[in-house]
Amino acid sequence: MDAPEIHYETEDFGDILKKDARFDPRAYDFVLQVISEASASAKGHVTGAELLDWFRDLALDAYGPMAYAVLTDWGVKTCEDVGDIVFNLYNAKRIAKTDSDSPADFIGGFDFRQEFLGPFEA
C-alpha cells in the first residue's frame, strides 16, 4: 500500500476551521486522502472501522515511527478525533455518508499510542 500524497492548502478548510479549530488543516487533508484510497480499494462505501484501519496503515506507511508525533501535532489523538474530522468534512459537504454512518462508529477503535508507537519500541 503506497502512502498518500499530501496536498496541503490551508484555505481549502477555512470554513471547517472557523467552526472547529481543534485539528490542523493537514489532518483534514490526510483524512480525505485516506477516504479516497479506502473508497477506491473497496469500490464504494467504507465503514468507520474500515476507515480507521486504512487511517492507521496509511499513517504508518507515510510517517513510520513519527506517525504518533505527526498526528498528535495535528491534534489527532484518538479514533474519536478521526471520526470528528470525518463528520466535519461531511457537514462541510466535502464527503457523503450513508444513513447508518455515525460518529459512534469511531469510538474505541484502537489505542493510538499502542498502534503508532508499539511497532517501533525495542
Identify the residue ranges that each predicted region occupies.
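Non-transmembrane, aqueous-exposed alpha-helical and coiled segments at domain scale
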Residues: 2-122
